[in-house]
Amino acid sequence: MAASGFFGECRICAAIVGYADLRFGDELGDYLDRALERAPERLRGIRQVMIEDPTGAAYRFVPIPPPSGVMQHPNFESGFRQLAQRGLSFDAAVFHPQLSEVAALAAAFPDTTIVINHTGHALALDLDADGRERVFVEWRKQLRAIARYPNVCCKIGGLGLPFWGFRFEERTDPIGYLELADAWRPYVETAIEAFGAERCMMESDYPPDSRSCGYVPLWNALKHIVRAASNDEKAALFHHTAARVYRIELPML
């Protein structure tokens, strides 16, 4: 619609990250070629949800759980190669125990940009404070390990999802940005310290994050957490990294 020119200077979907199942292997090439023919100036990458929870607890928040063992599928790597050969990026939605598998993928395809979604999704659902702390330590270890690969970026957000164990989704009172910032700060700061602002981008993950908070307090919380950052760091977090990774030629607002 935006490309039709009927809506003036509208730049809706200036860049698109589509879906494809990499388990199709080499057959994925034809699908990607058709997608690129349809949106040659807009298709930037592919995203696949690959979250796995052996306990099954997380799936009560996921109406249609993704298949298990996606990255272990015998055709997955060849499917990824089709994506890589076309210069597309890959958005990986996984829980933190799976980050090592994504790291192996980054090592195998060093010229392809991989974007870790939702800050690496620390899976701490239904845990008490001690349990969440143990998960935080393991998540931090995994995030720091994958950050060593220069072709990996981190999308900071998704913190309103229930998987983190904050239990904001159980609340009935409005949650303000300061309370969100206090809970989220260790995760946001860890991600930025691991990747650097130049490889991090802020995301709203809305409406899924609406389980926990409103759109305005969400963004205010993220901005509040990094309020002491330099102007260059803020520009990277809220504009430059996303513009570079997804090749979006839009001026800063």
List each language-model region with its residue ranges.
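Aromatic-lined glycan-binding groove of carbohydrate-active enzymes
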Residues: 135-167
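Alpha-helical packing segments of well-folded alpha/beta enzyme cores
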Residues: 31, 79, 98-101, 142, ...
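Mid-to-C-terminal alpha-helical segments outside catalytic/metal-binding sites
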Residues: 186-190, 194-201, 208-253
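Conserved, mostly hydrophobic/aromatic
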Residues: 16, 46, 83, 118, ...
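Non-cysteine beta-strand/loop elements that form the S-adenosyl-L-methionine
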Residues: 41-51, 113-119, 152-157, 201
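Glycine-enriched alpha-helix->loop->beta-strand junction motifs that scaffold or abut catalytic
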Residues: 41-42, 84-89, 108-115, 148-152, ...
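Histidine/acidic-residue-rich catalytic or RNA/ligand-binding cores of hydrolases
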Residues: 102-103, 125-129, 162-172, 208-222, ...
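Active-site gating/metal-coordination segments in enzymes
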Residues: 1-98, 104-107, 120, 133-135, ...
